Amino acid sequence: MNTSSRITYFIIGGSRGIGFNLVKILSASTGNTVITSIRGSPSLPKNKQVEDLAKIRKNIHIVQLDLTKDESIGNIADEIKKTPFFLGIDIFIACSAVSDSYYKVLETPKSVWLNHYSTNALGPILALQKVYPLLLLKKTRKIFFISSVAGSINAFVPLSVSAYGQSKAALNYAVKTLSFELKPEGFTVVAFHPGMVSTDMGQYGLDHFKEKNIDISGVNIITPEESASALIDVFRKILPEDNGKFFNYDGSEGVF
């Protein structure tokens, strides 16, 4: 097997939703190796579909990662290096997130703020700190964060998503900072809005807004597969001059 020409992806959060569909689509090409993380036991129902797919496609390798646990984050690089034929990571994709904060700012509990920040902003950055040396082993050096327009200041969405929006705004700031810090080493760091997606998490939000009689009739709702497919099309077009930018799933440039 010629492994030197293969593209290796590391996807955080590949067990379901957008992350699973990224794994599914990218692993369909035999020229790709997809390393993806799951949270919790492989036997859990939420991890079953990616575990089953990995049994069929030998270019999928699964590692354990809990973005809220220091020990788990600390072990992630070693877990990745144990995967078959590992030579380095070409493209890092942080996709895991939590979104269950539909409170007004003055009503949001401290635990909700901290959980969203830990999972959506701090966790992916701490994981990147650990796998950064593995990205240096390859010349591709692309880092993609699945963010959200909910974290945009200049394109503010007038919905009460408090802790979720704040956590994505923090992630977006990290993207901008990383883009200039890592540029001298040839990295391209980009944030992406995946659209309004009918994942379990997205559907929970949609149901909440409907229950509160909030008009979302103008929102284009897409499936996880549609989002992942569109994102991959944009991923493939990313050039070094796109470093530090924010793109929508349809390829249009967003604003921070």
Curated annotation (Swiss-Prot):
The keyword Cytoplasm applies. One of its GO terms (cellular component) is cytoplasm. Keywords: Cytoplasm, NADP, Oxidoreductase. Signal peptide: none annotated. NADP(+) binds at I18, S37, K46, D66, Y164, K168, V197, T199. The keyword Cytoplasm applies. The lineage of its organism: Eukaryota, Fungi, Dikarya, Ascomycota, Saccharomycotina. It comes from the Eukaryota. Gene3D superfamilies: NAD(P)-binding Rossmann-like Domain. This is Uncharacterized oxidoreductase YKL071W. InterPro entries: NAD(P)-bd_dom_sf, SDR_enzymes, SDR_fam. The active site is at Y164, K168. GO terms for biological process: cellular detoxification of aldehyde. It comes from Saccharomyces cerevisiae (strain ATCC 204508 / S288c) (Baker's yeast). It is found in: Cytoplasm. It holds the Pfam family adh_short. Belongs to the short-chain dehydrogenases/reductases (SDR) family. One of its GO terms (molecular function) is oxidoreductase activity.
